[in-house]
Regions:
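Phosphate/dinucleotide-binding and metal-coordinating scaffold of catalytic cores
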Residues: 1-237
């Protein structure tokens, strides 16, 4: 169980997040050095001029999972939670010992926003080639089987790739953050920055039971036909 985390923003520690075992609630304390800058990163939930050195306690509402509101948005979403649950089972961790801080530590530096959470669960980042087809097939099986999903020995490498590129992307449907070589189409983890000749994409996997990815593509094309400026997209599988 993670007891405390450093919260990092743009390379600077803005404060610490801790877990109160008795209250089963988290609390956040600003870094005094950060407070002196007067940068109001959460003016409604945790204003720097109104909080000072007082703890910002987590919210009781289920949606916040015992975290302060401005930190809860970094938690894994529905799809990320499915992958986190598989990771927990693989590592033989009791569900009763898991707190929201463990989930934030699992996200670490891979979140979609600017916040980073240290220490992070150790997973070596490598710019190895990813088999996007195997990734898509495993993602669909996990999504459809839900809590009954079990990872086969021959799927262990693909599962590690999926944990790396798939847990931080929000939303309900399976997706992953990848880097695609613009010359040969090679796919690598999108968590590795600065890869030359690679463009970065949020990949949304299809579903053989429901054409969610195809529907999103249709809406994309309708938007471009209507003259709306959209980011680049491509079909990779």
């Amino acid at each position: 169980m993670v007891q405390s985390l450093k919260i990092i923003l743009w390379g600077e520690e803005i404060g610490r997040l801790a877990w109160d075992v008795k209250r089963r609630l988290s609390y956040f304390m600003y870094n005094p050095a950060f407070l002196k800058k007067g940068l109001n990163i959460s003016p409604l939930a945790a204003p720097v001029d109104g909080v000072g050195l007082m703890p910002v306690w987590g919210e009781e509402a289920k949606i916040y999972q015992k975290l302060p509101a401005f930190l809860a948005d970094s938690l894994p979403d529905s799809w990320g939670n499915q992958l986190f649950e598989l990771w927990r089972q693989q590592n033989h961790l009791s569900n009763t010992d898991i707190t929201p801080l463990d989930k934030l530590s699992f996200i670490g530096k891979r979140g979609m926003g600017a916040l980073e959470f240290l220490p992070e669960v150790s997973r070596e980042r490598k710019a190895e080639k990813i088999d996007i087809k195997s990734l898509a097939n495993l993602a669909e099986r996990i999504f459809s089987e839900r809590e009954n999903a079990r990872i086969l020995p021959e799927e262990s490498v693909t599962m590690q790739s999926l944990l790396t590129v798939g847990t931080s992307a929000g939303g309900r449907q399976p997706k992953a953050i990848v880097a695609i070589n613009r010359k040969n189409g090679e796919v690598r983890s999108g968590q590795i920055s600065g890869l030359e000749e690679f463009d970065y994409y949020l990949v949304k996997f299809g579903n053989s039971q429901y054409s969610s990815a195809e529907l999103e593509m249709s809406y994309y094309e309708l938007a471009t036909m209507a003259g709306i400026n959209m980011i680049d997209r491509k079909s990779v599988v």
